[in-house]
């Protein structure tokens, strides 16, 4: 009898410690940026967390690429209606939007990327390129940045996105 009570008590303590740990903020100083661990993380799978990290890392890389492309191609920034590269970058990565921008004539994804390589396009090619890549990647994840237990990404969409990125990078280099 005393052994059963001891096991119950130990189980309750373990459960309480586990639940209280879920409320503590986990802070990482190195590696991929991951949100703090909270109660909502109980409804996430390992694959969901990996997809979140992947989306966030892609966004960070595209943001950095956009900043570098503006530094190397300042003439493209002059074609924009925004005076600084920071404003253009923030507009794409910090503000809420539906990926449809008037200067791209409503084109998103691969259609926006194609504008970059069109000779008669007079707009900001850096914005068209990065906006197209970003919207294509986000579309392959269902335009979500947070994934829970039953969420999934379509493998064919991820594959198509990866192939399109390879083609776009090749075209940019040639």
Q: What does each of the following model-derived ranges do?
A:
Residues 2-11:
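Bacterial N-terminal signal peptides that target proteins for export
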Residues 23-125:
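N-terminal Sec/ER secretory leader and immediately downstream segment
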Residues 109-174:
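Mature extracytoplasmic/lumenal regions of exported proteins
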Residues 18-21:
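C-terminal motif of bacterial Sec signal peptides marking the signal peptidase cleavage site
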